[in-house]
């Protein structure tokens, strides 16, 4: 069975800094905090939470201030099976002060910190490995024009040497992506007082050569200024994670019919998961479908797997019953029907057969958990989290 650590952020608590005023976006986005600015009709922060849930983060703490009640109302206390905590500053505390306020929620050996107005998707597994043994590890993003950020300089040992100031020269460079791994010891040393992580803590650690750099070419987006915010829609579209009309955000469910189905997590001998690229939306999901009249859940699962993948499988366990309407609402494109999915999730292993696509799938592929595509259908994410952490017999509402 799968090693739990195959999930790149398994056991990691994450802090997202969402307390800024967003003054540079005034006139473009005025009625919501910057991290909740809409992109393709959906709050920017939702994309970050989707990604962290998919990557297996143990929990997320939102460090807020400006319009904190609104942030809490929109995000709630759970996201696709991932707990969400809220830490609220009563007065401006700076980023380091905000983290100090949130310490009780951040208990993992290393804590991942990120800004709520940037998107950066490094190889989290490699990033975590690079951060081992260090107090502070900063991710360096490569951008075509580093003039507005300033750049990072590091030595052959991978330790940060200095920050170069912003310049008028429009040239590519390595910048601070605003994503960090911080040790529990360093986090514990922060005091609840106004203090900037970027302007005070990080420079002081740099002088003592205590900061490691993780360089990556992963895509980077900062929505802090109007022109970059305007580019966010194309950015997410190119990543194939723009919202799909098949998966509306939870709203009025009175018109929805409840559909009982199965969802099957099939592992191979390498611990990889079989996923199918759905023909109805182009996103990745798991084999499964409706339980027909006269069928048992097991019979339905075996039939759906055979029809959609060409495989014969052995059911090895019951993972849980998943029914949360906030993440399991689907509008089918062929007839417009709105359904709330209630899925019996089962574990299985392949016995025989050759992978064969069907009318319901564009592609079939085995993925290790840290390679699961970003454009995975929302109802599947919490099932994958449970399967990869070996959580069994759980009723998720």
Where in the sequence are the language-model features?
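Conserved N-terminal catalytic core of the sugar/cofactor nucleotidyltransferase
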Residues: 1-16, 24, 38, 42-115, ...
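Acidic, metal-coordinating catalytic segment for phosphate/diphosphate chemistry
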Residues: 3, 237-265, 335-336
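Short Gly/Pro-enriched turn/cap motifs at secondary-structure boundaries
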Residues: 27, 91, 141-143, 169-171, ...
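Catalytic-core segments of class I nucleotidyltransferases/pyrophosphorylases
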Residues: 112, 119, 125-129, 144, ...
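Short loop/turn microsegments at loop-to-beta-strand junctions
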Residues: 149, 177, 255, 261-262, ...
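Hydrophobic "anchor" residues
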Residues: 160, 272-273, 355
């Amino acid at each position: 069975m799968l090693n739990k650590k195959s999930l790149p952020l398994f056991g990691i608590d994450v802090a997202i800094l969402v307390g800024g005023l967003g003054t540079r976006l005034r006139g473009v986005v005025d009625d919501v905090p910057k991290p909740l600015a809409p992109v393709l009709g959906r709050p920017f922060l939702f994309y970050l939470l989707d990604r962290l849930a998919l990557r297996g983060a143990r929990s997320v703490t939102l460090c807020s201030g400006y319009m904190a009640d609104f942030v809490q109302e929109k995000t709630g206390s759970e996201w696709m099976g991932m707990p969400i905590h809220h830490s609220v500053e009563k007065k401006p505390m700076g980023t380091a002060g905000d983290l100090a306020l949130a310490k009780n929620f951040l208990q993992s050996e290393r804590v991942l910190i990120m800004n709520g107005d940037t998107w950066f998707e490094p190889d989290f597994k490699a990033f975590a490995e690079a951060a081992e043994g260090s107090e502070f590890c900063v991710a360096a993003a490569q951008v075509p024009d580093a003039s507005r950020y300033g750049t990072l300089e590091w030595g052959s040992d991978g330790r940060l040497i200095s920050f170069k100031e912003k310049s008028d020269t429009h040239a590519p460079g390595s910048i601070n992506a605003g994503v960090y791994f911080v040790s529990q010891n360093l986090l514990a040393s922060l005091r609840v007082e106004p203090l900037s992580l970027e302007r005070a803590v990080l420079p002081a650690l740099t002088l003592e050569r205590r900061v490691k750099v993780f360089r990556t070419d992963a895509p980077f987006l900062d929505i802090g200024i109007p022109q970059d915010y305007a580019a966010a829609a194309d950015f997410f579209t190119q990543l194939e994670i723009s919202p799909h009309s098949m998966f509306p955000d939870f709203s009025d469910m009175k018109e929805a019919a409840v559909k009982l189905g199965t969802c099957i997590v099939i592992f191979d001998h390498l611990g990889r998961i079989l996923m199918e690229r759905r023909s109805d939306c182009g996103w990745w999901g798991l084999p499964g479908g409706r339980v027909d009249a006269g069928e048992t859940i097991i019979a339905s699962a075996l039939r759906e797997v055979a029809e959609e993948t060409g495989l014969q499988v052995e059911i090895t366990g019951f993972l849980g019953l998943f029914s949360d309407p906030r993440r399991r609402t689907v509008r089918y494109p062929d007839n417009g029907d709105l359904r709330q999915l209630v899925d019996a999730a089962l574990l299985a292993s392949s016995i025989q057969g050759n992978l064969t696509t069907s009318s319901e799938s564009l592609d079939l592929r085995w993925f290790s958990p840290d390679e699961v595509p970003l454009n995975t259908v929302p109802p599947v994410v919490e099932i994958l989290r449970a399967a990869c952490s070996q959580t069994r017999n759980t009723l998720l509402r």
